[in-house]
């Protein structure tokens, strides 16, 4: 796929060329390279509110929000102030701080977990939660779902979503058969497949791990009380349920996805919003299980920068701002974006369905809702690249992959939505005119 680089991306092109000589693919996370859509990746210089500004001075309405964390938009004054205050007192101590305890209290107050361990990334959170589940149950097998992405953990990359879906990789070289031999993969939203797996491996499965709502194969909501049924099946066999709320946590509601379906999983992972946009994440769960972690128990987990005081300050400030009224605004903005996208595509006669999981959304270029990874791939995905690039050329920054979720912030204005509406007209036309290769 080719897409012409226009003159107003000259500095991005220059820096991308330099980056490719120093960094694999020129990026530090694959989807940023525009690999599935082609064209010139934009190097962002700064952002304020709902606006991204690249190194060439181009401005974009941001519908990525750093892949979820920026609920209030970029550089919110209260978050900036909290970070500035933390920085002057020291960047890292390698010792306990009051802020760590207060952030843990914030998480416990809003979710079903009783205890929390802070880490540095969503990948660390899911890796640690799986290790803890195995240690607690004294079992080795784990069950995951096609299209659900839980970070680049070796055992969890089998049939993963996100960047793995974008680049059509079933897993990754460098991961041995031994590392995935205890990973059972079944279709998402298929409760009978889960029951069959437990029937085939009775007493062997340590945990089920699932995204609380799918966000890495496009947006796919759990259906028919799926998470509640997972919990019941796991407990009936002595296994645990891990719900990955790295994406949905404090994004989809005040209490995350737990606030929507009230399923109290044994272990829950958090990231993105809880970090305030800095490198931080967490996992938590029932005290009986969490107390298996060192130094209280035998399951080892550690991190030099875990609970970093600057990241903790950003996370606490973000959660303080994220009250119930904020979600009313974000949900309304998601509904408004949903309507604009659907109206534009309908006007051009493009078959589509807007996938929703609360205020998270994506586009399936086919009729009807997708309920699993196979459904999401069985669409006119070739329409997305021209749709994306036309939006980008008209000042709207959407996720550069059909398999990624769109995020809105409370910072979006009427002017932003007017810009989005105008950009969607030629974008929908480009999608309609696209041809399968």
Swiss-Prot record:
Q: What InterPro entries would the database entry show? A: 4pyrrol_synth_GluAld_NH2Trfase (IPR004639), Aminotrans_3 (IPR005814), Aminotrans_3_PPA_site (IPR049704), PyrdxlP-dep_Trfase (IPR015424), PyrdxlP-dep_Trfase_major (IPR015421), PyrdxlP-dep_Trfase_small (IPR015422)
User: Per the UniProt entry, what species is this protein from, by scientific name?
Assistant: Corynebacterium glutamicum (strain R)
Which GO BP terms apply?
A: protoporphyrinogen IX biosynthetic process
Give the family per the record.
Belongs to the class-III pyridoxal-phosphate-dependent aminotransferase family. HemL subfamily.
Localization recorded for this chain is: Cytoplasm
Reported cofactor(s): pyridoxal 5'-phosphate
Q: How does it assemble?
A: Homodimer.
What is the protein's given name? Glutamate-1-semialdehyde 2,1-aminomutase
Chemical reaction(s) catalysed: (S)-4-amino-5-oxopentanoate = 5-aminolevulinate
In this UniProt entry, the residues modified to N6-(pyridoxal phosphate)lysine are 272
Pathway(s):
Porphyrin-containing compound metabolism; protoporphyrin-IX biosynthesis; 5-aminolevulinate from L-glutamyl-tRNA(Glu): step 2/2
Highest taxon in the source lineage:
Bacteria
Q: Name one GO molecular function term.
A: transaminase activity
Which parts of the chain span the membrane according to its record?
none
Which SUPFAM superfamilies does the UniProt record give?
Answer: PLP-dependent transferases (SSF53383)
Query: Which keywords accompany this UniProt record?
Result: Cytoplasm, Isomerase, Porphyrin biosynthesis, Pyridoxal phosphate
- Encoding gene (name): hemL
Q: What is its EC number?
A: 5.4.3.8
